[in-house]
Each structure stands twice: as structure tokens, then as C-alpha cells.
Amino acid sequence: MNIHDPILERPSQCETHGEFIAKCFMNNHWTKCQTCSTEERAKEARDTLNAELRAKTARLNAKINNAGIPQRFVNKTLSSYVIDTNNDKQCAIFAFCTDYALDFEQVMKTGKSFMLLGSVGTGKTHLSIGIALEIIKRGHSAIFTSASKMFRNVKETYNNKGKSENEVLSAFTECDLLIIDEVGVQRGTDYEKDIMFDVINDRYENLRPTIILSNLSVEETKAHLGERVFDRLRENGGKAFLLNWNSYRSIAEAVNYQAVEFAS
């Protein structure tokens, strides 16, 4: 039988779906139950989709793991952040963070940075990690670190024949978004200020945004970081937001929230 021969048909029986008409097209090959064939194709499509989803999830989890986000905070998304809808300013900072994450492609064109400052437990870490998780989901890279850990990682290269100082610093300078937590709990030595400047300045020059988290006030943060770092963070409309409502961790009622632009 060749391709020009007429199609042959014959009744056949499927153990699952019962009677069907089998067809022979060429090489004496008879078709299977059409319903079985349709189900097999659908299963193959589902299996392919599930495999792609598993691979995508694995890649996302790897990026989150590489971002240095502590296990306690890996589920701290923006959508899980609880706000007091009666507090207009808390709603405003949440809206700012949400827009920052959703418009991150535009943020990367300007390198716009900002700070979340103020009292312990007001949700600064949650908001910043929520931004990181959102941009990672969108294909960008992020690093979350404390200032102390960043300084320690650099110092460890001095007595280590493994990574060089430049290799360690590149992890902080080359990611799309860098979040530096606990700024201000260090001694603020010249060495620490120099490392901070090197990181922030490199990111500033390459339009890579940075988020600073600190329990200090605006003026205290400025004094701790130094004029050079502070000036670079305020470029392109960089802002400092002062969170001074009651502890977010206890889900208490929110009070006074003030958003403050960098002083000129």
C-alpha cells in the first residue's frame, strides 16, 4: 500500500472506550482508538507543561536562595504585607514599594534608590524583601544582606586564598537590586565607610538601585553613611521614608507615619 492508495477502514475494539473505526493509511499501519490518542496527546501536553513549571519553580527557588533571603522571610511577599487602611501614609509607602517593584524596568533606567528608616518592627524588612521577591519572579536578580555581613565577607578575603576582594564585592555591585539591612549597628569606621562607598558608588555609576534599611533617623543615617554615599543615594529623586508607627510585628494599630525626602 502506498500514499496514493485509498484509505482502508475496519471496525475495531478498544478495551477502554469500546468500538471504533480503525483506519489504515500506509505501510499497513492501523490507527488506534481516536479517544485514546487524544487522551495520550493531552497527557503528553500536561506532562510537558508540568515539567516546564517544575523547572521554572526550581530556577525561581535557586534565584531566591542565591539572593540571600533568610528562610524566615522567604514568604514575605508584598501581597502578604498587612497595612492599616486608615493610615494614609502607611498606605502611601506600601503603594510606593509596590509601584517600585512593578515598574522595576523603569527604575533600572535611572538607578533610583531609597531608604526605609525608623523604629524596630515596623515592616521594613518585609517590604524590601517583598520587592526583591517580585523582581526575582520577573527575571531580575537581587541580593539581601546586612551591612555587617557585607563587611565580614570582604574581610574574610584578606586571609583566604579563595575569592578575592573584587570577586566578593562584585556580588554586591552587579546584582540588579541590592538591599542592605541593619545599617547603623556597626561602628562606622573609616574602613566600613570606604567599603560602603565602593559598593554604592559602583552601583550608582552603573544605574543599579539600592535599598537601605536602618533603625536610625534620616540625619543619623546620613552621619553614619557619610556625605559621599548619602549624596549618591539621593540622586534621581532618591527618598528616605521614616517608619515610626507601632510595631508591625504585633499587628498593632498603626500610628504616625511620615515620609521624608532627602534633605537638600
Residue ranges of predicted features:
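A short, basic N-terminal segment
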Residues: M1-C91, A240, A252-S264
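Pre-Walker A (pre-P-loop) alpha-helix and adjacent loop at the N terminus of AAA/AAA+ ATPase modules
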Residues: A67, V82-F114
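Short glycine-rich substrate-engagement loop in P-loop NTPases that contacts/grips substrate
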Residues: Q90-C97, E134-E174
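Walker A/P-loop nucleotide-binding motif
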Residues: M108-S128
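Residue-level preference for the first positions of well-ordered beta-strands
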Residues: G111-M115, S141-A142, L177, P209-I211
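A conserved segment at the C-terminal end of the G1
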Residues: I129-L133
